[in-house]
């Protein structure tokens, strides 16, 4: 769960059969990312490893844009693989080792092929729900939490989550028995 657990929800690879308690390998790696609920310590829809391509061959940033269009009332926070978001009281700080690859080019624009340094992105859907455009802006290196996060105007659960829970019942049953 990592970063996702602190947020209202997150962009999860829980649909990857290799991550199931009883792992199976789908040789075609034909699985989809899914929106999963978090503990809601911070408002927003979090995408960890934002700059990475997982075993399904899909760049998380690209898929996160699609997820944002399905959940246009939520603010997205994309955290690169080597970046971290530190929150202390009313302030936040982006931690970014400059010797690691990431999606932030020197001019502050996005690199889908990790030609920059790690960073954190803020994503918003602008326009009508069915035709909204996802806008991405680089989060400042530090600032007020109130400027980074915002509460959702609408939330819709991902209907695919039930299917994943059905495919991976052992993990759910193990948690229930505790």
Which functions belong to the PLM regions below?
Residues 1-8:
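Catalytic nucleophile loop
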Residues 12-178:
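C-terminal and late-domain segments of enzyme folds
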């Amino acid at each position: 769960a990592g970063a996702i657990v602190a947020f209202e929800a997150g962009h999860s690879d829980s649909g990857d059969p290799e991550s199931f308690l009883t792992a199976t390998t789908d040789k075609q790696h034909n699985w989809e990312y899914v929106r999963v609920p978090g503990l809601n310590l911070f408002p927003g829809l979090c995408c960890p490893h934002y700059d990475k391509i997982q075993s399904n061959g899909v760049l998380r940033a690209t898929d996160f844009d699609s997820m944002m269009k399905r959940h246009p009332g939520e603010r997205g926070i994309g955290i690169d693989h080597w970046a971290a978001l530190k929150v202390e009281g009313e302030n936040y700080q982006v931690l970014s080792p400059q010797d690691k690859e990431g999606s932030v080019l020197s001019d502050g624009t996005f690199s889908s092929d990790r030609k920059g340094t790690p960073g954190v992105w803020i994503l918003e859907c602008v326009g009508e729900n069915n035709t909204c455009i996802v806008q991405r802006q680089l989060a400042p290196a530090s600032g007020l939490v109130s400027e980074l996060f915002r509460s959702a105007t609408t939330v819709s659960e991902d209907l695919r989550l039930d299917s994943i829970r059905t495919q991976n019942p052992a993990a759910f049953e193990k948690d229930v028995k505790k």
